């Protein structure tokens, strides 16, 4: 992965090429005059060269993000609420208590082994199984071809929304069972009305609750991705001991044609979620909202301090035209390191022994450069975005935020 400080330099260069008022959000006050000088010297040559360089920088950033090309999301693309909630929990924007009312539980175990979460909606035109038996059954096909070859899937879950049943005198005491199967053979190769399947997960649920149900479908998804076995989809079966066939399955949102209507179908349709790791960086670890510590130094004192320290640098994705496919965050505080490393180096400058020796030699021999002010600690950010295939991705990117600076 490209180091974080190189990424920040690329973003800064992109802003120089774009010009205009966008510098206010990305370049600190001390650098604006230099940017203006660069633009002035460039003159007429800037027009043609800037677009070519911008394409190169954009390609570098997209490669760092693991994308083959710049996403061009369609107007029909839907961001599942589940993925938005996962982002807010994982990034620390909201605590679990604030979002618990939605019924979402953070998937600690799957996320602990993954740095990428992807969501997939099913192909609607393949959902009906002809000639099914007495129970309500549907087949779903999920296209997982957008998962990169280098991403190893560790687990997968199928999320189904079910609504409270209030039909009949005994509905409060009623239960129904939801069975999830992997389809082992396509319908065309078997006797009509029968599918060759294997059971993946099952659950007995109560009628009088409206909520999302999560089922483990990892064995099927691992066969499709790791073992490269054919993907014939999943079958969902809903049964009830005391319910007629007419009403079976109507409380589980697995079809657009339900009596409840299709206005909110986009957010309530079945969702397949995969957890994977591309071998780069750490897994999705939840970040708690940091408490701000009181500032002990006045702004005037900070301006006088020219020693190595961290400075503010806000990266706004709208400045590079990426806000159409990056869902969250709209930008982030990247910070940068700048300042002197004077002799003698103070303890708070977080110096190495080599930097101390180099600074000592510089004090008597100016041909030896001073130690440099560089990032000594970097942290990750989480990004929620639409990829090239209109699939929603939550990914952890390492070395994106400067946490500490020092003389090295």
From Swiss-Prot:
A single GO cellular-component term on record: endoplasmic reticulum lumen
What does the record give under GO molecular function?
BMP receptor binding; chemoattractant activity; co-receptor binding; cytokine activity; growth factor activity; heparin binding; protein serine/threonine kinase activator activity
Q: Where is this region: Disordered?
A: 283-307
Write the signal peptide boundaries: 1-19
Residues the record marks as carrying a glycan: 143, 208, 350, 365
Q: Where in the cell is it found?
A: Secreted, Extracellular space, Extracellular matrix
- Tissue specificity remark: Expressed in the lung and lower levels seen in the kidney. Present also in normal and neoplastic prostate tissues, and prostate cancer cell lines.
Q: Which keywords label this protein?
A: Chondrogenesis, Cleavage on pair of basic residues, Cytokine, Developmental protein, Differentiation, Disease variant, Disulfide bond, Extracellular matrix, Glycoprotein, Growth factor, Microphthalmia, Osteogenesis, Phosphoprotein, Secreted, Signal
* Residues with PTM Phosphoserine: 91
Which residues form each disulfide bond in the chain?
308-373, 337-405, 341-407
What is one process in the GO biological process aspect for this record? Answer: anterior/posterior axis specification
Q: Which residues form the propeptide?
A: 20-292
Q: What does this protein do?
A: Growth factor of the TGF-beta superfamily that plays essential roles in many developmental processes, including neurogenesis, vascular development, angiogenesis and osteogenesis. Acts in concert with PTHLH/PTHRP to stimulate ductal outgrowth during embryonic mammary development and to inhibit hair follicle induction. Initiates the canonical BMP signaling cascade by associating with type I receptor BMPR1A and type II receptor BMPR2. Once all three components are bound together in a complex at the cell surface, BMPR2 phosphorylates and activates BMPR1A.
Q: How does it assemble?
A: Homodimer; disulfide-linked. Interacts with GREM2. Part of a complex consisting of TWSG1 and CHRD. Interacts with the serine proteases, HTRA1 and HTRA3; the interaction with either inhibits BMP4-mediated signaling. The HTRA protease activity is required for this inhibition. Interacts with SOSTDC1. Interacts with FBN1 (via N-terminal domain) and FBN2. Interacts with type I receptor BMPR1A. Interacts with type II receptor BMPR2. Interacts with FSTL1; this interaction inhibits the activation of the BMP4/Smad1/5/8 signaling pathway. Interacts with SCUBE3. Interacts with TGFBR3.
Q: Which disease is it linked to?
A: Microphthalmia, syndromic, 6: A disease characterized by microphthalmia/anophthalmia associated with facial, genital, skeletal, neurologic and endocrine anomalies. Microphthalmia is a disorder of eye formation, ranging from small size of a single eye to complete bilateral absence of ocular tissues (anophthalmia). In many cases, microphthalmia/anophthalmia occurs in association with syndromes that include non-ocular abnormalities. Non-syndromic orofacial cleft 11: A birth defect consisting of cleft lips with or without cleft palate. Cleft lips are associated with cleft palate in two-third of cases. A cleft lip can occur on one or both sides and range in severity from a simple notch in the upper lip to a complete opening in the lip extending into the floor of the nostril and involving the upper gum.
Q: Which family does it belong to?
A: Belongs to the TGF-beta family.
The protein, known as: Bone morphogenetic protein 4
The coding gene here is BMP4
